[in-house]
Amino acid sequence: MAAAAAALSGAGTPPAGGGAGGGGAGGGGSPPGGWAVARLEGREFEYLMKKRSVTIGRNSSQGSVDVSMGHSSFISRRHLEIFTPPGGGGHGGAAPELPPAQPRPDAGGDFYLRCLGKNGVFVDGVFQRRGAPPLQLPRVCTFRFPSTNIKITFTALSSEKREKQEASESPVKAVQPHISPLTINIPDTMAHLISPLPSPTGTISAANSCPSSPRGAGSSGYKVGRVMPSDLNLMADNSQPENEKEASGGDSPKDDSKPPYSYAQLIVQAITMAPDKQLTLNGIYTHITKNYPYYRTADKGWQNSIRHNLSLNRYFIKVPRSQEEPGKGSFWRIDPASESKLIEQAFRKRRPRGVPCFRTPLGPLSSRSAPASPNHAGVLSAHSSGAQTPESLSREGSPAPLEPEPGAAQPKLAVIQEARFAQSAPGSPLSSQPVLITVQRQLPQAIKPVTYTVATPVTTSTSQPPVVQTVHVVHQIPAVSVTSVAGLAPANTYTVSGQAVVTPAAVLAPPKAEAQENGDHREVKVKVEPIPAIGHATLGTASRIIQTAQTTPVQTVTIVQQAPLGQHQLPIKTVTQNGTHVASVPTAVHGQVNNAAASPLHMLATHASASASLPTKRHNGDQPEQPELKRIKTEDGEGIVIALSVDTPPAAVREKGVQN
């Protein structure tokens, strides 16, 4: 490598060492003190060409090559040959070491490439097959072996000196130094090449293509018809005329990438380019492999697809060969009724799969309609389901107040007409969660809402995100209503209007006693707030904390119940204690938490069926024996008693405190 670097730095002059140099260059034959006429650069090697012919391939037991490219099976043993033709003119510097039959390597002649490998080679993206005529190489070009990423950069070192020498002898050089000695024939009329000025927002794109910028795709001056003055000097360097490009199919790829055409389009292209507008199956294969290098090295399965398209597509007609025509196999033609349409779409490129041209601004979960109002409780919306959509994020406002002002109109709650499970799509946050479908209708004046939140325990250890739901319980206010809630309820239970509700993690706020219009009834509003983590140290001193696990996802359930007046009237028998009439209400749930009670439908059924009268006990012995008052015991010995007031003056109602 050091020898190659030294030879590279002294290119054009006799190097100090005589090595041809380069990792991967395994051939000799380079005379000491010779001139380097070309350079081959790879990823891990550099080779200086000092003789007339150089072979590139891979070493084997059958022989070695000048430049070895490793052991890839896609590279033949003798894959490429780079040579200079004999009889090139020189510009000085003799090489007496070379035999007289060989031209001087520093003669500065043109370089040619001959492909010897069966897989061919790409020269600047143009495929060169085996057996093709030698290709004249430009001063700098790149070779790439098919089906690999192995590349070689070829650089001619002597051509620069020849151009400088010819340029100094040219008379044009002294007159206009900035013009190269090239003859450019500019026609008098350029109207067919000049297009009108583009509009400020005009786009130039092919059919069914997606422009990548607002200004449009296609900035090539020759393809879109615009010719700038600075582009005139580039026309002389265009080695292939425009008409030749159109004849050979200018849209065909020059590399081995898969063309963006269907098999039917490839068949139409092949048939329309035939002289008599008909081809045999073998002729279609030949046309495709000639114009699209991808199908030369690809699997032969594409040929089966071509045959299937010909036999199944109604636009292709099979024409038998006449007896006078030599050869075998039938011809294929295009249906004349659809020929013009098929030819028009033959070169229309397909859009890549999975890349839509225009994306909708809304995702699959979003909806054009506005989400449900927060005031309409019980209606499942994007806000309560946990799924965030662009619509819900853009229209998210301040939440509705839980306790509206006295002057504000109370919203009408929905009444459940049917309850069923709505299964959402798999993978969504709402999958396998019960959803209550509600229908809105007018409610009587006697129904008053009691709103609270229930935090259900975690029954599984899955990593699903928590689903938040809202609990709304609508009770009919009977003649006897709750007037006080005192003490500490047991873990996972508390009682509202004689019904026990499961709550593993909640703080019971002090009840609010609100007088009704007649002054005889009171209503309690119990608000339960979830606590994410509660330690045992705080349980000893707190008097209104219910213990549960540290992490509990909050779920909400909508429970709405309507009953006519008098259905839930509780037959309360007064109890005389110190001259005060007190009715005690036992709890309906004791012991451990029942996981089934956390289900919304189960809770709905339990709540609807718990309409039996609540028993009470009279301290005098003349009445039939009733179940005793049951107090809920907690770990620290505290209990809770919920007292109900009878239709007596408010002064006769007192609150029963904590029982130890």
UniProtKB/Swiss-Prot annotation:
The modification N-acetylalanine is found at residue 2. Residues 129-171 are annotated as: Required for interaction with DVL2 and SUDS3. Residues 1-14 have a biased composition (Low complexity). The keyword Metal-binding applies. The C-terminal part of the DNA-binding domain may contribute to DNA recognition specificity. GO terms for molecular function: DNA-binding transcription activator activity, RNA polymerase II-specific; DNA-binding transcription factor activity; DNA-binding transcription factor activity, RNA polymerase II-specific; DNA-binding transcription repressor activity, RNA polymerase II-specific; magnesium ion binding; RNA polymerase II cis-regulatory region sequence-specific DNA binding; sequence-specific DNA binding; transcription cis-regulatory region binding. Residues 242-258, 619-632 have a biased composition (Basic and acidic residues). Residues 258-353 bind DNA. Residues 15-32 have a biased composition (Gly residues). It is found in: Nucleus; Cytoplasm. The lineage of its organism: Eukaryota, Metazoa, Chordata, Craniata, Vertebrata. Changing residue 154 to A: Abolishes interaction with DVL2 and SUDS3 as well as DVL2 nuclear translocation. CDD domains: FH_FOXK2 (cd20055), FHA_FOXK2 (cd22723). Changing residue 527 to R: Abolished SUMOylation. It comes from Homo sapiens. Residues 1-36, 85-104, 203-260, 359-407, 610-632 are annotated as: Disordered. This is Forkhead box protein K2. Signal peptide: none annotated.
